[in-house]
Amino acid sequence: MGVLRVYVILILVGFCVQIVVVNSQNLTCNSNDLKALEGFMRGLESSIDGWKWNESSSFSSNCCDWVGISCKSSVSLGLDDVNESGRVVELELGRRKLSGKLSESVAKLDQLKVLNLTHNSLSGSIAASLLNLSNLEVLDLSSNDFSGLFPSLINLPSLRVLNVYENSFHGLIPASLCNNLPRIREIDLAMNYFDGSIPVGIGNCSSVEYLGLASNNLSGSIPQELFQLSNLSVLALQNNRLSGALSSKLGKLSNLGRLDISSNKFSGKIPDVFLELNKLWYFSAQSNLFNGEMPRSLSNSRSISLLSLRNNTLSGQIYLNCSAMTNLTSLDLASNSFSGSIPSNLPNCLRLKTINFAKIKFIAQIPESFKNFQSLTSLSFSNSSIQNISSALEILQHCQNLKTLVLTLNFQKEELPSVPSLQFKNLKVLIIASCQLRGTVPQWLSNSPSLQLLDLSWNQLSGTIPPWLGSLNSLFYLDLSNNTFIGEIPHSLTSLQSLVSKENAVEEPSPDFPFFKKKNTNAGGLQYNQPSSFPPMIDLSYNSLNGSIWPEFGDLRQLHVLNLKNNNLSGNIPANLSGMTSLEVLDLSHNNLSGNIPPSLVKLSFLSTFSVAYNKLSGPIPTGVQFQTFPNSSFEGNQGLCGEHASPCHITDQSPHGSAVKSKKNIRKIVAVAVGTGLGTVFLLTVTLLIILRTTSRGEVDPEKKADADEIELGSRSVVLFHNKDSNNELSLDDILKSTSSFNQANIIGCGGFGLVYKATLPDGTKVAIKRLSGDTGQMDREFQAEVETLSRAQHPNLVHLLGYCNYKNDKLLIYSYMDNGSLDYWLHEKVDGPPSLDWKTRLRIARGAAEGLAYLHQSCEPHILHRDIKSSNILLSDTFVAHLADFGLARLILPYDTHVTTDLVGTLGYIPPEYGQASVATYKGDVYSFGVVLLELLTGRRPMDVCKPRGSRDLISWVLQMKTEKRESEIFDPFIYDKDHAEEMLLVLEIACRCLGENPKTRPTTQQLVSWLENIDVSS
């Protein structure tokens, strides 16, 4: 009987559930909700898939079935509704590729509980009415492009989640934020542009568990009221400008599990309160100004898993109680002032996997106890004064799980051990650079089949490069530069599997600390945050290698950098090198190479740095988009080369003797050819005459063909001028040729990204710059004309104006206004004589002008224009040093040689944003990234990248960011312009530059924000 009752109950429950489901599916929108959704839809730039939009009849009324919408009946919500309509309670439209504005009509959805629009491209401001929805529980607008001030009048009594992470809100965080949020659990305002201090009223959010304020411009100290948030489990304050001491009241946050205060300006001692924080598993305080010893409570924390105190001024001995710290997995204490020996008890921290002790002066050896360090996977002792490399390697080989080992700048002038019994079976990354080590490449490395990255550069290693390196199938980065290796390049290196195809690509190890490479007393270091940041590279430069360059190098399609500079290589440059389709840098300079430069190299569409200087090459220099951008220095020291970067090429006259002999041998062939040609010509003329007579007799003339012919004839002789009010003031191609001496090399004033630029003085005395776009532009004449006319309409005081265009042979000529002071690149990097370089006021004015020009292209010009190649050489200066952007929009006029390279990917190494490596679509935020690099050039006076340099900072961005985290900003700035009077202004510009360089495009500012920020910087007199 009991069983029967259960069955009856189950049947009834199932029946009721079915009724509820049926009723839910049949619900239709309340008329007010329907209008609100219509208003929301009209604010978007495109329709939503799954929404039944009908222009003629408005919406389909059955909106409760639409994608992303959940409804409840008005009765179930306790509403008095005789029609029992469906009320919208959830709007879940995250990751729907939405763009446009968030309509204020959404605020009319008065029963809405969840509004989730995360990861779209919505923009504009947030209406204050949206923050007065009394039933709203979740508001997630994260990862969009919303901007403006955040509304200060907030009345959301039911709200549990407020997430506006990764937008562009600015101004103060509203002081009243927490006044009417009694149920709030999560507040995430990170990755915006909020400034000022953390409001005192934050303490009123008594129920909050997650508080994210990271990556803003917040300053001042942490308000004491924040430490009243006893429910707080996550506090994220990193990447701001917060300062002052860290209060001991921190211990009141007893539920805190994650605390990140890194990259701020906190100072003083770290409070000794960690025994009270017995749930804290993540603590990062790196890149602050903390001093004193590590708190004992921190060294005895049973809960800590990740501990990062890198880049402070902490002192004393490193002490960790591994008996207590049973959960510790990652330890980063690098760049501090600790003293004493390496803690020998660390292997007793049984879960510890990654250790970074870089830049700590131990002056000691690696403890014998490390043989028992079985949990260790990543270890860095870079620049830590470690001694006895033989002992170190013998001990560390016993760490069976070790995958990453960095020992740079230690063991000075010791000998790299060659004991064949050494084994590192799981090692993936080995960096022992800048140690002046003696010896050879040790055979024991062949016992590391998983090796992906090997850097033994800047040592004194000798002998030959072993062929077995080519059998390391995972190796994608090999740097043996600046040693004394001899012999041929092993042929086996041309078959490295990880460089042949993407199918053989390997997953990079990801330790929790940065790598520092090639750092010694002569130059700053180059930082890589992950092994995957290293470009696929073979660098054998600055050795004594001989023999030829293997043609099979062309099989390495994934290789980005091939540097064979400063060796004794001979023979020809193989044409097969054009197969390295991903190559960005090719340096073969300072060798004994002969023959010509293979024309096939023009197919290397990504090639940004190229040098064959100081060899024995001859013949014409290839022409093409990439080769026209390389400086003359790339080809100097080769007397036999000719072309646009060297002396003009001429047809060599044969000697009289040789000519006479050839003439006697071929006289019969010449007579035969002449007779045959004559007869053929007579025949063709006869046929042509008959066709003309036949056509004329019929009176047939194709007007369209005649118009095309006339247009081509006109285009080849005349110059189309824009904005020319004087119709009598015409310009002909003859005028252009005369003004440039038929494009004589002496008139070249620049090598732009799309062709050579010539200076010309027109018959009326006007100076102009003429850009010669060589080769096929990939467009018909009419398409080209339409594009050029569009560009000519871009008129702004900070743009180089396009004055006209014409055809010349197979080339297109663009005529621009002339800028007397040349490029910013010249003034920052090339000017060596005359008056001093640009002062700070001028540099700031140039930055402002360039920003205004870019903002015009992005926001005011119709149609909007992406520049795609912002760099210092594309910022030209007038006689009064007013900045003018050049080369905007030219990417649409040029098609590269390879079809796999789109016009969107045009750019210059050092300026290309990181996301362009994964996508083929250029964006406005990509231009902003490149502008950030230019700001760094203005601040530092340094080029963004010079991969071919054997020393120095190759990557300006990495160097600046590292110096910034170490609070060494004053060392970043160009000494010519840096002084205390301008320090604050320069720091502000540096902050703007770093904003532009954010890895996530959505976190970068708009160009209008750039203009506003730069204009608000007051220049000291």
Swiss-Prot record:
The 36 amino-acid island present in the 18th leucine-rich repeat contains a ligand binding pocket that directly interacts with PSK. An island domain has also been found among the extracellular LRRs of the brassinosteroid receptor BRI1 and has been shown to be critical for its function. It is found in: Cell membrane. LRR repeats lie at residues 21-43, 85-109, 110-133, 135-156, 158-180, 181-205, 206-229, 231-252, 253-277, 301-325, 326-349, 351-372, 373-397, 402-426, 428-448, 449-474, 476-496, 498-555, 556-580, 581-604, 606-629. The chain crosses the membrane at residues 673-693. The keyword Cell inner membrane does not apply. Pfam families: LRR_1, LRR_14, LRR_8, Pkinase. It comes from Daucus carota. This is Phytosulfokine receptor 1.
